[in-house]
A protein has these predicted regions:
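Acidic, small-polar-rich N-terminal luminal/periplasmic segments of exported/outer-membrane proteins
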Residues: 1-100, 204, 486
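C-terminal beta-signal and adjacent terminal beta-strands/loops
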Residues: 46, 449, 502-507, 554, ...
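Periplasmic-side early beta-strands and strand-to-turn transitions of outer-membrane beta-barrels
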Residues: 96-97, 104-110, 114, 121, ...
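Flexible loop and strand-edge segments within Gram-negative outer membrane beta-barrel domains
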Residues: 184-252, 266-278, 284-292
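Outer-membrane beta-barrel signature, preferentially recognizing the C-terminal barrel domain
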Residues: 219-250, 360-366, 416-426, 430, ...
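Gram-negative outer-membrane beta-barrel transporters
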Residues: 378-384, 393, 496-510, 517-610, ...
């Protein structure tokens, strides 16, 4: 979240939810529609299908990141499927980022504390160079607890407003080895392993399940509810092996060649343990969910510079070949802790609570083959940027015994193992015109697409306890988008600014929360929204006040982001669009110290589609977040050339507020009522909190 705290039109959600952050939101598009990658390798999608199966996207440690690139709007020309709404690219540290000029060895030690989650960071990076070889080794560990809410009620169930207690440990290892065997040639090896392990006492679920703001079984009949207590463990791991090779090639076809091969294994293990007491029996019940993605990615990129007449060209072209294998399962057990129906003795197995290993989708293998080309053409004050990409995607479902256990549980439904294939040509055209040395106008048209997931095509789940079913839809069409953007950039001695206006059209938008009409019970089946639009504007700028006689180093900056979304099929708003947001700051920078006072202002959320909303608190409509304004103060001080202290105090006025990304859609279906009922105060952001970091560059 800190990476995009001041970025217009970009946010991160996930407060109060099990598993951590849910991913990026860019211009009203979020989740798996935003491609997130580390060194060109995509991190897994999020997954939710049933009360104990919800994965988030906590796969990246910011301590290894040297640079982040955020691409707003459709980006399929560069990245293919899943970049329909934008892309976030992380680039990891290299030896040159740690070794100081003129030296062959370097190190960076860092320690930090955050009061919002009572977490301590310990990080160490060492790097060295010898002749043609260089290497880097990094290890970081963050130990903390739950991120606080503004609520102070430490009770249980719907009454609880404090965050659920958590113990969190996140670790990351990064190792790199490079061989510069020529001036323009390099061979590199990379190994990375990230792990996020958190234990949660889900006190907000005690006493459930809930319906219309009260326990399903009244507390006068069953004190403590069916769920007497519940704890959970979420372990997220991501391991990557990579090789990268770049070299100069003085030929007619290319000046430079760069290729890479990466293998990544990412896995989410979720385990839930609860004391289950449905009056007739008392059982210690466990539920285990596994979601895993394995992928191989080969990328090759070539570039060639040449001139034709008065135009200069930089042609970039290449290919991407990717294979993803996705597996998932859920299972459970029940052990009697008292004699009752189905429990003949303490310690015996409760057959009614045993969940045979099952899967909600057939394990897919997804093969993607891509070709792309882009030409940067410079002519006088004009720059043209045409691009084209072709993607062929094949999804092969693999019918497993675990999936058959789900499909055949009630003897209904058919199973299809038919392959799905999609072809897509994605064009892009951009141009810029230098009006003067200081001002540049630009325009862009780009297309994007996203293929349906195996879960939406084949996924099945039935929960008779809470009365809902998830049904497959094998007729889903891929999502498609067309994005138009124009803007003006200015850069001059007194400051800079960037103004952008965008209009994005979406076809066949996949709604995974759609309610299937005509069924006796609540049935969710993904469908295509034929047409949707999101339009908006963003402004970002900085003014150097010292150019107008103020003290040297004093500046002001600001950004405003506005977006408007509409489901053109129903006329309803698109809930993933955030309210109008502005961030304004006054800063002061010197060679060895500086600070920034920021004021974040967010308008109340007034356009909401709550036609399918159900709340465990008994509220009939979606909660609309009120507007708010908060102050943050951050600063740094270089004690010596090698030692820097930085920190900040956030929410200075200790204000209670909600972020729309955290609140929207947190309804009674699935996780909200069964595993974590949502008292709205528990979804608030922390009150006044601070961070402090000490960095020593050796």
């Amino acid at each position: 979240k800190d990476l995009v705290r001041y970025e217009p039109g970009v946010s991160v959600g996930g407060a109060g939810q099990r598993g951590g952050i849910s991913g990026y939101n860019i211009r009203g598009i979020d989740g798996d529609r935003i491609l997130t990658q580390v060194d060109g390798v995509e991190i897994p999608n999020g997954f939710f299908n049933g009360p104990y199966a919800k994965s988030q996207r906590n796969y990246v440690d910011p301590e290894i990141v040297k640079r982040v690139e955020i691409l707003r709007g459709p980006a399929s020309v560069l990245y293919g499927s899943n970049a329909i709404g934008g892309a976030v690219s992380y680039y990891t540290l290299d030896a040159d980022d740690i070794i100081k000029p003129g030296k062959d060895v370097g190190a960076r030690l860092k320690s930090g504390y955050s009061s919002a989650d009572d977490s301590w960071l310990k990080s160490a990076t060492v790097a060295g160079r010898s002749g043609e070889f260089d290497g880097l080794l990094h290890y970081s560990q963050r130990d903390g607890h739950e991120t606080e809410s503004f609520g102070g009620n430490n009770g249980t169930g719907l009454a609880r407003t404090a965050a659920n207690p958590e113990d969190v440990r996140a670790t990351n290892v990064l190792a790199k080895l490079g061989w510069n065997y020529n001036d323009d040639s390099r061979l590199g090896l990379t190994y990375e392993k990230y792990k996020d392990d958190r234990d949660t006492d889900q006190k907000s679920a005690y006493g459930g399940p809930y319906f219309n703001g009260a326990p399903t079984i009244p507390s006068s009949v069953l004190p403590g509810g069916m769920y007497q207590w519940r704890t959970g463990n979420d372990t997220i791991t991501r391991e990557r092996f990579g090789i990268e090779h770049s070299f100069a090639l003085d030929s007619l076809l290319a000046d430079n060649v760069k290729w890479s091969l990466n293998h990544q294994i990412a896995k989410t293990d979720q385990s839930t343990e609860e004391l289950y007491y449905p009056i007739t029996r008392k059982v210690l019940r466990t539920r285990d969910t596994i979601y895993e993605e394995k992928q191989w990615v080969f990328d090759a990129q070539l570039d060639k510079a040449f001139a034709i007449g008065d135009t200069d060209h930089l042609l970039t072209y290449g290919t991407t070949i990717k294979q993803q294998k996705v597996t998932g399962s859920r299972s459970g057990d029940g052990t009697c802790v008292a004699v009752g129906r189905g429990c003949t003795a303490i310690g015996a197995t409760s057959a009614a609570d045993v969940l045979a290993k099952a899967s909600d989708f057939p394990d897919p293998t997804i093969n993607t083959y891509s070709l792309f080309a882009q030409d940067q053409i410079s002519w006088n004050d004009w720059t043209f940027l045409p691009g084209l990409r072709y993607d062929y995607t094949q999804l092969k479902p693999h019918i497993t015994e675990e999936f058959l256990n789900t499909v055949n549980a009630d003897g209904q439904g058919t199973v299809s193992d038919k392959n799905k294939t999609w072809h897509k040509v994605s064009p892009k055209f951009g141009l810029t015109y230098a009006l003067t040395d200081n001002y540049t106008w630009y325009g862009q048209y780009a297309e994007g697409f996203r293929t349906p997931t195996a879960k939406s095509l084949y996924g099945r789940f039935e929960n008779n306890t809470t009365g809902y079913t998830v049904a497959p839809n094998s007729d889903l069409e891929p999502e498609k988008s067309k994005g138009f953007e124009t803007g003006l950039r200015g850069n001059f001695e007194q400051g800079s600014f960037d103004v952008a206006v965008f209009y994005n059209k979406y076809r066949d938008f996949i709604n995974e929360d759609a309610v299937k009409p005509g069924d006796d019970q609540l049935t969710f089946q993904s469908n295509n929204i034929k047409r949707a639009t999101i339009k908006g504007a963003e402004v970002k700028g900085r003014l150097n006040l010292d150019a107008f006689g103020a003290p040297q180093g004093l500046y002001t900056q600001g950004s405003i982001a506005y977006a408007y979304g509409r489901n053109n099929d129903s006329g309803e708003p698109i809930n993933s669009v955030n309210p109008l947001t502005g961030v304004f700051g006054l800063g002061y920078d010197q060679d060895n110290y500086g600070g920034l006072l920021s004021w974040t202002v967010v308008k109340k959320k007034d356009r909401v589609d709550d036609s399918n909303f159900k709340s465990p608190d008994g509220v009939s409509s979606q909660f609309k977040t009120p507007g708010f304004g908060i102050l943050d103060l951050a600063g740094y001080y270089k004690v010596t050339d090698d030692v820097t202290v930085s920190g900040g105090v956030y929410n200075l006025t200790d204000k209670k507020y909600w972020l729309w990304d955290d609140v929207r859609g947190y309804d009674s279906v699935g996780e909200a009522s069964v595993t974590q009922p949502a008292n709205l105060d528990r979804l608030t952001q922390p009150g006044r909190n601070f961070t402090i970091n000490l960095i020593w560059d050796i």
